[in-house]
A protein has these predicted regions:
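N-terminal secretory signal peptides that target proteins for export/translocation
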Residues: 1-8
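Bacterial N-terminal signal peptides
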Residues: 11-21
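N-terminal periplasmic/intermembrane-space "pro-region" immediately following the signal or transit peptide
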Residues: 26-123, 235, 291, 455, ...
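Outer membrane beta-barrel
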Residues: 81-248, 255-274, 283, 320, ...
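Outer-membrane beta-barrel pore domains
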Residues: 127, 170, 195, 275-468
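A short secondary-structure junction signal
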Residues: 238-239, 249-254, 291-294, 349
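Short helix-to-loop capping/linker segments positioned immediately adjacent to catalytic or ligand/cofactor-binding
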Residues: 249-253, 267, 305-306, 324-326
Length: 468
């Protein structure tokens, strides 16, 4: 019986302890409930304050006119890419770019009497330039979207001789349908490949020899260009140009109307993710009236020759680019070539103090170049170029008919000019380029000109991507 009484005693003791703690736990529950009510009230007040502030902001937004969206800056490139069509007031402010260029040159032969043997002199864009330090050519470019329909570009060339000339000044449409675009004003012709590229974007200090011989440098048009880009995966571009034809090999005609034009086609594509290519064919037709040049006859006497007739030029161009997986920051290679052929038919005048003669003239002349540029390290490149010209078949009526000897046309004597160039450049940034170039120039009759040049280029301001 003793164990039973002991069990009752323990149960009673437990009940007494529990009853003693109930008031304490009830007090704790009340305290927790009070804290929860306080937190709920505090959060409710904060929510009401935020809702009130939100209502005020919504009222302000509803009564304030929306701000104009910030425009994208218009794209700029010496060979400009299709520009942005961003709106807003700032879109009417032109993007400004300045290219500062200069060099120092050591030339074996006198550059003042530089002439490419076998070809009619083509103007000031021929030759290696001056000896010693030369400020060279700098460029000032302004570009902008005029409105949603037109893009404008002005590029002025500032020479070291304190002269300013307009390289390009044109407007281009932005809103024509079906892949069409129309350009009007002064612009570099789209024929070939390198003709459209501004001098600061060349891979060498100077242009290929064939461009100097046949165009006197870069061929520009004062006129219009209509271009069509096909809506296909394969890049297909067709273009037609016309203008006043005043640049060599044409001249400004002494009458109203146009002077010839050009037809262009370019195609291109990618091969995998590392190789891309582009190829093209171009045709240029112009007329020349009294396209004059100075010469020396066989006795050293001064002669003024002048060509009048039709000039037609065909251009075939191709370029292949390689960059590992499309990333050209580390390594890349570019292989580029062009072939040009010019046919001219008309009359050639021969004028001296004692004679004024003229007879038929016909010439079939050509030239080509091949160059490769390899970027072997980030910002470091090496390149080599080979130039070749053929003065071809030249038929001079005054010579064929026995009126004058061939020596009377000294500059037109048969020749095969050549040049080999090598360059090495360093690009500390995308805005700076320092280039060292050495060339063996055999473009003259019998003089080899060894040319060593150090060039600098600096870009200031807006600077867009160059053409492919």
């Amino acid at each position: 019986m003793f164990p039973l009484h002991r069990s009752h005693a323990l149960r009673g003791f437990a009940i007494i302890v529990l009853l003693a703690t109930l008031p304490a736990r009830a007090s704790e529950v009340s305290e927790l409930r009070a804290q929860l009510d306080a937190l709920r009230s505090d959060y409710q007040a904060k929510i009401q304050a935020l809702e009130s502030r939100l209502a005020q902001l919504e009222t302000q937004v509803a009564t304030t006119p929306p701000a104009a969206a910030a425009p994208e800056p218009p794209a700029f490139a010496p060979a400009p890419a299709p520009p942005s069509s961003g709106g807003g007031a700032n879109a009417f402010n032109p993007a400004v770019s300045v290219i500062l260029g200069g060099r120092v040159a050591q030339l074996d032969a006198d550059p003042t009497d530089y002439r490419i043997a076998g070809f009619m002199p083509a103007g000031d864009g021929v030759g290696p330039g001056s000896r010693g330090f030369d400020l060279g050519e700098s460029e000032l470019t302004l570009t902008a979207n005029v409105d949603p329909y037109f893009f404008a570009n002005l590029t002025a060339s500032l020479s070291g001789e304190n002269t300013v000339s307009v390289e390009e000044a044109y407007v281009r449409t932005l809103a024509l349908p079906s892949g069409l675009s129309l350009k009007g004003g002064r612009f570099f012709s789209g024929l070939g490949y390198v003709n459209e590229v501004h001098s600061h974007a060349w891979d060498f200090v100077d242009q290929p020899l064939v461009y100097q011989a046949l165009f006197g440098g870069q061929l520009a048009q004062d006129g219009a260009q209509l271009k069509w880009l096909a809506p296909t995966d394969l890049f297909i571009e067709l273009a037609a140009e016309t203008g006043n034809g005043q640049r060599f090999p044409g001249t400004r005609l002494a009458r109203n109307g146009l002077n010839g034009g050009a037809l262009l086609v370019h195609v291109g594509n990618d091969i995998g993710d590392s190789v891309s290519w582009r190829a093209g064919l171009s045709w240029l037709s112009q007329r020349a009236e009294n396209r004059s040049f100075a010469d020396l006859d066989g006795t050293g006497g001064a002669v003024a020759d002048a060509f009048t007739g039709r000039s037609r030029t065909w251009v075939a161009d191709a370029i292949l680019k390689w960059a590992p997986h499309g990333n050209g920051n580390l390594r890349s290679f570019k292989l580029q070539a062009e072939y040009l052929r010019r046919n001219e038919d008309g009359q050639l005048a021969f004028v001296t103090a004692q004679q004024n003669l003229a007879d038929s003239y016909s010439a079939r002349q050509s030239g080509w170049y091949l160059q490769g540029v390899y970027q072997f390290l980030p910002r470091w490149r090496f390149g080599a170029r080979y130039d070749s010209l053929d003065s071809g078949d030249v038929a001079i009526g005054l010579v064929q008919h026995g009126v004058l000897p061939l020596t009377a046309f000294g500059v037109l004597a048969p020749a095969a000019p050549r040049r080999v160039s090598a360059m090495f450049d360093w690009n500390p940034s995308e805005f700076t380029r320092l280039r060292l170039q050495y060339a063996w120039d055999d473009a003259r009759m019998s003089v080899r000109d060894r040319q060593l040049m150090l060039q600098y280029l600096y870009a200031i301001g807006a600077h867009g991507a160059h053409k492919f």
